[in-house]
Regions:
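Intrinsically disordered, low-complexity non-transmembrane regions of multi-pass membrane transporters
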Residues: 1-22, 28, 75-93, 208-239, ...
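Interfacial helix-loop-helix linkers and transmembrane-helix boundary segments
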Residues: 43-51, 99-101, 122-135, 274-283, ...
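Membrane-embedded hairpin module used as a gating/binding unit in multi-pass transport
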Residues: 195-273
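Alpha-helical membrane segments and immediately flanking helix-loop junctions
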Residues: 103-108, 116-121, 135-147, 151, ...
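Transmembrane helical segments that form the transport core of multi-pass membrane transport proteins
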Residues: 243-331
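Alpha-helical transmembrane segments
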Residues: 187-204, 316-327, 347-350
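Hydrophobic transmembrane alpha-helices of secondary-active transporters
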Residues: 37, 102-128, 266-268, 285-307
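Entry/N-cap segments of selected transmembrane alpha helices
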Residues: 24, 124-149, 196, 303-329, ...
Length: 404
């Protein structure tokens, strides 16, 4: 008993003192950051379904470090670095989140589940009503996804790392996770955390960007519709989804799990399977998103901050989202010119594929300047196109980048 000291008895404190001031400072910072995320999630400033479990995971993993039997520092949550099969099987019986991580996270399954749920939210009828405008705006809103690659390469990142962080500009968390797992697995944790942190800020940040770049007289434009938009029945939407899924899987088989998951969600929505729809759009989507937040949180141990690339990723993430927002607004102005003034440029911001947040942002801004202007239908069309376009770019990057 006399050999048991305070540091041995309370190993969280003991490992803090034994790990050196740099690692200890990083652990303290991440604990404070986790508490901040919990607070911001509770206040509704960030997405609570992701940020609260992520923040609590950060707190627990950095407080719950202990000394393992071999003398190294570890935890009882999970070990993402395991590759030996026997060691992995042993750890899965000890670390309670290791089975969840190994069987759903590291293979992209959880990202596909989230994407399947997103598919149930998409009414492709809005895209079919104005396909040219929707697709054009979506392409413009990928400006950050394209331009961030050379910027990141200039800052010293490899091409695979650059493409992974550039996908933050697509404003779709599962897409970022899927791409980084395929191209830069050693950086998928910081890249995905950066993506979800910044995506939570789009609802609060993009309105300022729109107001900066779009004068009030343009924001207040009320679009005149000469004829009522055509309503497509479920049969057409289902056929469209099936054909597009087949084409995209044929062209980019490496990203076919994403395409399949997205359009399966759309098919469930349009096929009238109410009980399956309720499951996929509810428990599956929200449960997967919640567990994604949990896993991202417990993966944020102190070594994350010690990676010299983390600062670059933080900067590049915000640059990618900023450029994508600017690109979408530029596309809105081009459509304004093409339509000879009968188009509201604010719709361009909705092409950034954070479903349905950016579409709501567009309508909220427009309604504030002109309560009689309704752009939500056009905004949702651009929004849905943005999701599909981001998935296509993911397929292009994963297919082409390894050969460059």
């Amino acid at each position: 008993m006399e050999n048991i000291d305070f540091a041995t008895l309370f190993q969280g404190i003991g490992t803090m003192m034994a790990s050196g001031w740099v690692l200890a400072s990083a652990r303290v910072f991440l604990v404070l950051l986790g508490l901040l995320l919990i607070y911001l999630g509770w206040k509704g400033m960030l997405e609570p379904m992701v940020m609260i479990p992520m923040g609590l995971g950060m707190v627990a993993i950095n407080c719950g470090t202990l000394i393992m039997p071999d003398g190294t520092l570890g935890n009882l949550f999970l070990d993402p670095m395991l590759s030996d099969t026997d060691q992995l099987m042993n750890t899965m019986q000890i670390d309670f989140l290791q089975p969840v991580y190994t069987l759903t996270f590291s293979n992209g399954l959880i990202a596909c589940f989230v994407f399947m749920g997103i598919g149930t939210l998409l009414d492709v009828g809005f895209l079919l009503q104005k396909p040219f405008a929707s697709i054009f705006l979506a392409l413009c809103a990928e400006l950050g996804t394209f331009l961030t690659v050379p910027i990141a390469s200039a800052l010293g990142l490899t091409l695979k790392e650059s493409a992974s962080v550039a996908m933050v500009g697509g404003a779709d968390g599962p897409m970022v996770l899927f791409t980084s797992l395929a191209l830069a697995k050693h950086l998928f944790v910081p890249i995905t955390v950066v993506a979800y942190l910044y995506l939570g800020l789009t609802y609060g940040g993009y309105p300022y960007l729109v107001k900066l770049l779009v004068p009030k007289r343009f924001r207040a434009i009320k679009m005149v519709t000469k004829k009522a938009p055509k309503n497509y029945d479920a049969k057409v939407k289902l056929a469209f989804s099936a054909v597009l899924c087949a084409i995209l899987c044929f062209l980019f088989p490496v990203a076919s799990p994403l395409f399949f998951s997205l359009f399966l969600g759309v098919a469930v929505r349009e096929s009238g399977m109410k009980h399956i729809y309720d499951f996929v759009s509810g428990p599956l989507l929200y449960g997967s998103t919640f567990m994604l937040g949990v896993l991202l949180g417990v993966l944020c141990d102190a070594h994350l901050l010690l990676d010299p690339k983390i600062l670059k990723l933080l900067v590049l993430g915000i640059v990618a989202l900023l450029l994508s927002g600017i690109g979408g607004i530029i596309g809105g102005y081009i459509m304004y010119i093409i339509k000879r003034g009968n188009y509201n440029p604010v719709i361009g911001i909705a092409a950034v594929s954070c479903v349905p947040t950016t579409a709501k942002v567009a309508q909220k801004i427009v309604s504030k300047d002109n309560p009689d202007s309704f752009v939500l239908g056009d905004a949702l069309g651009a929004n849905i196109s943005g999701v599909i376009t981001s998935a296509i770019i993911t397929g292009i990057y994963i297919t082409i980048i390894p050969y460059l």
